[in-house]
Regions:
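Short amphipathic C-terminal alpha-helix that caps PH/PH-like domains
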Residues: 191-203
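N-terminal topogenic membrane-targeting module
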Residues: 24-97
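Residue-level detector of alpha-helix boundaries and kinks
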Residues: 21-25, 184-187
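Short, strongly hydrophobic alpha-helical membrane anchors
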Residues: 1-4
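Single-pass alpha-helical transmembrane signal-anchor segments
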Residues: 7-24
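Structured extramembrane domains adjacent to transmembrane segments
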Residues: 72-191
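Residue-identity detector for threonine
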Residues: 27, 51-52, 116, 133, ...
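Generic secondary-structure transition motif, activating predominantly at the C-termini of alpha-helices
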Residues: 41-48, 159-166, 200-203
Length: 203
């Protein structure tokens, strides 16, 4: 004799599955975002900077710093694909959304010109026109600028310094605040420290 289907039991089972995903996923995501944030704080401290504020959530961290060379103040926002909601996580994977680190900074001596370098294989290429008019291709980067003449020597210096890094999506210098924009992958803490070290030397 076949038992009749019980819709209420099915709803309970689905609810239990989603709740389990939420609990396990939230814990794993919190640990991941805390690990990334702590590694950034440690890297900044080792380079001579200081953390002024830090907030950690399930899928994001917001950090504020000061005193990293000529970078008077800067903030770092890290966002990851949370595992707490299985549907959202699957959708983010299908859409090829990547974990992202965004840095915005105030430089004591603002840049004399504005330009942006976007890695040709990065997700940031989809929005390249937001950063100005296409100017040139330099190695693996596309140069965009809202000005007619980008500082060629400094641009080449930046490209040369960033060449070893494969986590960088975009770096932008501006005469207006924020003077510095950086988009990068937060996946490898040691490379984030290298990126911060390079930026400290460049500015």
């Amino acid at each position: 004799m076949n038992e009749s289907f019980d819709p209420a039991a099915a709803v309970v089972i689905v609810a239990i599955i989603f709740f389990s995903f939420y609990v396990v996923g939230s814990t794993a995501s919190r640990k991941k975002i805390a690990k990334i944030g702590s590694s950034i704080q440690q890297a900044v401290a080792e380079l001579g900077g200081k953390t002024t504020a830090a907030r950690f959530g399930v899928s994001a961290a917001v950090l504020s710093f000061k005193g990293l060379g000529n970078m008077e103040q800067f903030s770092v926002v890290v966002g990851i694909s949370s595992w707490a909601n299985p549907l959202s996580y699957v959708i983010s994977r299908v859409m090829k959304k990547k974990d992202l680190l965004i840095l915005r900074g105030k430089i004591s001596k603002p840049p004399s010109s504005s330009f942006t370098l976007i890695h040709k294989d990065s997700p940031a290429m989809r929005y390249a026109d937001r950063w100005g008019t296409f100017v040139d291709r330099i190695d693996s980067y596309v140069l965009c600028s809202v000005e007619e003449n980008a500082p060629k020597n400094f641009v080449e210096q930046v490209v040369s310094a960033l060449r070893p890094l494969d986590i960088l999506y975009l770096v932008s210098f501006s005469k207006e605040l924020p003077h510095l924009h950086v988009y990068a992958s937060p996946s490898e803490p040691e490379k984030i420290k290298t990126l911060l070290s390079i930026l400290k030397k460049l500015i």
